[in-house]
Amino acid sequence: MSVPTHQQDLIALLEERGFVHQCTDRDGLAAHLAAGPATAYLGFDATADSLHIGHLQGLMLMRWLQKAGHRPLLLIGGATTRIGDPSFRDSSRPILTEAQIQANIDGIARVFSRYVELHDDSLVNNAEWLDGVGYLEFLDRVGRHFSINRLLTFDAIRQRLDREHSLSFLEFGYTLLQAYDFVELSRRRGCTLQLGGADQWANIINGVELSRRQGGAQLFGLTMPLLATSDGRKMGKSAQGAVWLNAERLAPFDFWQFWRNCDDRDVGRFLALFSELPMDEVRRLGALQGAELNEAKVVLANAATALAHGEHAARSAADAARGVFADGTRDSGLPMMKLSRARLAQGLSLTDLLLEHAIQPSRSAVRRLAAGGGLRLDGTPVSDPDAPLAGEVDGLRLSLGKKQHLQLRLED
């Protein structure tokens, strides 16, 4: 593909692909990026050991910036994770231990490396400067520049209070910490651009303003639209749970299936955001109708899976899907469900198995699925899921409806 250089209007390209919601100074940022390589940062708190597809838009945006010659900084909030961003949340996050935070940082870094070429200095932890700053020093350096009256006007704070939900002083101070992060990254690393979701707008503006009030560099902020599927679901979730970006939490086959099964109305938009296809091809694929649109969904699934898990995983997932839906053959590309010979000998049923693996929420849900013909072993409907499994089950394909398929694997 043709990769833009930093001399071109990168903002126009990002707008065309659907990445831009708001910008603190659109023309100023376009000129700044055209003037030469800039340093941009994207921040995440280390609340889990992976990221999910709700974070994917930001990773792809950072990828485009790096392709255009700009320098990525990926900030993981080792310090701010202890507090939790209250933006548009109804309750406080649980407090994590230092060991949990570090394990999460390690997991997130592995996901980053799939999308952005990391160098030794690409990954930053805000504990580097926040752990060493004293409370009185922080109030003097940062607190003096913020008005409580103005902070109370921000949507994230106001909505929490309007709903009469508790907001601790710890959480109230989060926006000041994020503003300080931006200024410190500007001072230490020459960072001039912060990226974030639309819910981060107030936090980003505060960083831009703090730098100005302290006589620092001119900083810029760019937010992305908060994505939802056309049927109203928040990006990051599926009916089965979070759609994670690492294979340990979600099998590449299930990741591929998420994209293959997306709503027809989302195909063009998702291709623009989550693939690197030229926009002419995106528009062509997005305009397909009927059965032809399924071809576009396969292109989307292959592209998104190749970025998250590699080309081999994408091909294996596509091959596995063809095996399931076309000729009914078994395929090792399916996610495995393990069961022990000892449990099988004790009279393990399919209902037991699905509940133990948290695939179904209740016995009644399994029975309803079976009654509707949606529970099958190697294509054969299971009429009584409560009956003990019998015969040779190793390698059998277990299907739950039309879109969820697993391969049984027997272990000693």
UniProtKB/Swiss-Prot annotation:
<keyword id="KW-0067">ATP-binding</keyword>
<feature type="binding site">
    <location>
        <position position="237"/>
    </location>
    <ligand>
        <name>ATP</name>
    </ligand>
</feature>
<dbReference type="InterPro" id="IPR024107">
    <property type="entry name" value="Tyr-tRNA-ligase_bac_1"/>
</dbReference>
<dbReference type="InterPro" id="IPR002305">
    <property type="entry name" value="aa-tRNA-synth_Ic"/>
</dbReference>
<keyword id="KW-0030">Aminoacyl-tRNA synthetase</keyword>
<feature type="binding site">
    <location>
        <position position="41"/>
    </location>
    <ligand>
        <name>L-tyrosine</name>
    </ligand>
</feature>
<comment type="similarity">
    <text>Belongs to the class-I aminoacyl-tRNA synthetase family. TyrS type 1 subfamily.</text>
</comment>
<dbReference type="InterPro" id="IPR014729">
    <property type="entry name" value="Rossmann-like_a/b/a_fold"/>
</dbReference>
<dbReference type="InterPro" id="IPR024088">
    <property type="entry name" value="Tyr-tRNA-ligase_bac-type"/>
</dbReference>
<feature type="short sequence motif" description="'KMSKS' region">
    <location>
        <begin position="234"/>
        <end position="238"/>
    </location>
</feature>
<keyword id="KW-0648">Protein biosynthesis</keyword>
<dbReference type="GO" id="GO:0005829">
    <property type="term" value="C:cytosol"/>
</dbReference>
<keyword id="KW-0547">Nucleotide-binding</keyword>
<feature type="domain" description="S4 RNA-binding">
    <location>
        <begin position="348"/>
        <end position="411"/>
    </location>
</feature>
<comment type="subunit">
    <text>Homodimer.</text>
</comment>
<feature type="binding site">
    <location>
        <position position="174"/>
    </location>
    <ligand>
        <name>L-tyrosine</name>
    </ligand>
</feature>
<dbReference type="Pfam" id="PF00579">
    <property type="entry name" value="tRNA-synt_1b"/>
</dbReference>
<protein>
    <recommendedName>
        <fullName>Tyrosine--tRNA ligase</fullName>
        <ecNumber>6.1.1.1</ecNumber>
    </recommendedName>
</protein>
<keyword id="KW-0436">Ligase</keyword>
<dbReference type="InterPro" id="IPR002307">
    <property type="entry name" value="Tyr-tRNA-ligase"/>
</dbReference>
<dbReference type="GO" id="GO:0003723">
    <property type="term" value="F:RNA binding"/>
</dbReference>
<keyword id="KW-0963">Cytoplasm</keyword>
<feature type="short sequence motif" description="'HIGH' region">
    <location>
        <begin position="46"/>
        <end position="55"/>
    </location>
</feature>
<dbReference type="InterPro" id="IPR036986">
    <property type="entry name" value="S4_RNA-bd_sf"/>
</dbReference>
<dbReference type="GO" id="GO:0004831">
    <property type="term" value="F:tyrosine-tRNA ligase activity"/>
</dbReference>
<dbReference type="GO" id="GO:0006437">
    <property type="term" value="P:tyrosyl-tRNA aminoacylation"/>
</dbReference>
<keyword id="KW-0694">RNA-binding</keyword>
<dbReference type="GO" id="GO:0005524">
    <property type="term" value="F:ATP binding"/>
</dbReference>
<comment type="function">
    <text>Catalyzes the attachment of tyrosine to tRNA(Tyr) in a two-step reaction: tyrosine is first activated by ATP to form Tyr-AMP and then transferred to the acceptor end of tRNA(Tyr).</text>
</comment>
<feature type="binding site">
    <location>
        <position position="178"/>
    </location>
    <ligand>
        <name>L-tyrosine</name>
    </ligand>
</feature>
